[in-house]
Amino acid sequence: MRRWKAAALVSLICSSLLSVWMCQEGLLLGHRLGPALAPLRRPPRTLDARIARLAQYRALLQGAPDAVELRELSPWAARIPGPRRRAGPRRRRARPGARPCGLRELEVRVSELGLGYTSDETVLFRYCAGACEAAIRIYDLGLRRLRQRRRVRRERARAHPCCRPTAYEDEVSFLDVHSRYHTLQELSARECACV
């Protein structure tokens, strides 16, 4: 009977030590395991734009009951880059080397803002700018296709996300040329996102 008690005690101690050791290893490996447990994010695109577009359409059409055959999309992947039609202003701004959507800042005079105030004071104006290509969703691809087929009119909906402020600075105060103080609400952006 004494042997069983000793064996049970040794087993209990060994399992406790093993449990503590596993927890410590898990905490030490947490740096390496952290990204695997983090929410999924889309990796930055490194493929050729034509191949990426083909992959997007393939993902869009996968499983759709009235899906177009994927071989209809193959001419897009085989297209030789050449002279294209003139790009629109949004496409020119979001050229391939453009920075991603983010907060930018510029020091400007209040009168340059065009809000009707005459002042020589300068303010730090924060604004949102950048490309939102990584934020394109299946919705955007589907809407773009419907617009191409003229099922949705152009002015009704946008088929791509825009870099916009999601939060604003509380207020900005300044003195005009007549020595009066003015306070403007939500003049500068505080946070930006692709919406």
Swiss-Prot record:
Disulfide bonds join 101-163, 128-192, 132-194. Residues 20-95 form a propeptide. It comes from the Eukaryota. One of its GO terms (molecular function) is receptor tyrosine kinase binding. SUPFAM superfamilies: Cystine-knot cytokines. It holds the Pfam family TGF_beta. One of its GO terms (biological process) is cell surface receptor signaling pathway via STAT. It is found in: Secreted. Residues 1-19 form the signal peptide. GO terms for cellular component: extracellular space. Growth factor that supports the survival of sympathetic neurons in culture. May regulate the development and maintenance of the CNS. Involved in the development of the neural crest. Might control the size of non-neuronal cell population such as haemopoietic cells. Acts by binding to its coreceptor, GFRA2, leading to autophosphorylation and activation of the RET receptor. Heparan sulfate-binding is required for signaling. Homodimer; disulfide-linked. Interacts with GFRA2 coreceptor and RET: forms a 2:2:2 ternary complex composed of NRTN ligand, GFRA2 and RET receptor. Also forms a 4:4:4 tetrameric complex composed of 4 copies of NRTN ligand, GFRA2 and RET receptor, which prevents endocytosis of RET. This is Neurturin. It comes from Mus musculus (Mouse).
